[in-house]
């Protein structure tokens, strides 16, 4: 293609949404992606007929921007049951949303996961987080999530047996130092909609977005070495020019391209996928570890959500470990199997390890203060813009929003009508 109007560095969700908004306004785009495919962290690998999402991820269907940008019907979404199965003191306890699963309300109320008062406060928390608009959440007084939960009146019991393992699996932060604003936003999204997986894996989300761009708009295997005046230089020396450049990469890579040394620290995770013949749990619930044991924090069985995640007659188990582990794959597999045999019995020894994912930058640290993702967009220069998690909060919702807003800033800078 001839020189595009806009060069976008990175074909993750932010970059793709930015490109689509630019195309809607008649601007030509070229996305340069260093890896071999679109999606950024939202990728799925196919191994021996199994679909392995790169790190445990779900689509929260209440995300407003996802509702605007995605065709849920075409994604063929499959849903987790609302709630969790919590491992505590050698037993499993069902902890479900009584408003969605009234038949399980009594079991949840009588479980040792929190007091009766705690469970009543969860209803109050749901009401609190669903008040006002999303911008309102990011204007409320900010604290750590742990401080917020304690101030709300929750006991140490429910904090340690539910909130800590659950939120550790969401934000990869055992200390619950994540901003209370992020917690309120996340809790609102979980309570307002479903947690789902596309039938063909999380990769279906970026692939759906990419399919709406003209052929030739995306170039993979194109790593950008540096940003130049209204253009970029690729590794290998090729220079590409446009009227504007948008950097839509992960935070550390964006900082590198901008020449900034003050890089926001990251939260890492390790994920192990196993194949098995019989699922260790009977229904599509998230399993949370409230015993404080190592290494697994949470697990799920994606095939109970969407059978297409595995070949016929087999099941897939996805485990999540907080942080990146230094052990080799065999040693880590042994640790995980030993732990899970205590949960599910000796049959775990027959599970077959499919792959280990070590993701050092699973999310940026999101401790207070966090930026308001609804604030007016600020460009870096008259022709250079950023979007995604760089100096912003991280979630699928805000990745999409930041891409759209970056595109609108570019359109205004290039004097195009919105």
Cite the ranges covered by each PLM segment.
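N-terminal Rossmann-like FAD-binding beta1-loop-alpha1 element of flavoenzymes
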Residues: 4-31, 411
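Hydrophobic/small residue at the entry helix of a nucleotide-binding pocket
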Residues: 13-14, 38, 402
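Glycine-rich FAD pyrophosphate-binding loop
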Residues: 23-47
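Short beta-strand to alpha-helix junction loop
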Residues: 57-64, 140-141, 152, 188-210, ...
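Mobile amphipathic helical/loop "lid" adjacent to a hydrophobic cofactor/ligand pocket
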Residues: 63, 67, 71, 76-176, ...
